[in-house]
A protein has these predicted regions:
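Gly/Ala-rich phosphate-binding loop of Rossmann-like dinucleotide-binding domains
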Residues: 53
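Hydrophobic positions on the alpha1 helix immediately C-terminal to the Walker A/P-loop
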Residues: 43-44, 48
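P-loop/Walker-type NTP enzyme "switch/lid" segment
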Residues: 1-12, 16, 21-23, 34-39, ...
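Pre-Walker A (Motif I) flank of P-loop NTPase domains
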Residues: 25-30, 41
């Protein structure tokens, strides 16, 4: 997805800074958010996930923007089943059922991409529920 060497290096540098951050040495999740449409959050999230999968056996990228999903378009995946379905079904231990996986060409590691799933009326309630926290 990263098209040029300078961008690739920038994402690898960002990944390394996150991995070796002494203030938070055991980071297992990262949230990228923006208040402004078109600020590049999806591009950064997707490229950072791809960069992480080169060094880690499994990476899970979740599109939490249920009202305006975009990650499914970036990876050309179906958005019919995803995060909202997993939360509504309380089936979070079987997250892989709601994902599409991609194998990294160089490392054979897996990138799991979870789309938003079906649209729901109570998006904020769903994302602030204890099920999402788990």
């Amino acid at each position: 997805m990263v098209k040029n060497k300078a961008s690739s290096n920038a994402y690898r540098r960002l990944r390394t800074n996150i991995e070796y951050n002494s203030k938070y040495p055991n980071v297992h999740s990262i949230c990228l958010a923006s208040a402004n449409k078109g600020s590049g959050t999806t591009t950064i999230a997707c490229n950072l996930a791809i960069t992480f999968v080169a060094n880690h056996s499994k990476v899970l990228l979740i599109d939490c923007n249920i009202n305006k999903p975009t990650i499914n378009k970036y990876f050309s995946i179906d958005n019919a089943l995803g995060l909202s379905d997993m939360l509504l079904n309380q089936d979070y231990s079987n997250y892989y059922r709601y994902c599409t996986n991609f194998k990294d060409d160089h490392s054979n590691n897996l990138l799991y991409v979870m789309g938003t799933g079906r649209k729901v009326k109570n998006t904020l309630d769903l994302l602030s529920s204890r099920y999402f926290q788990e």
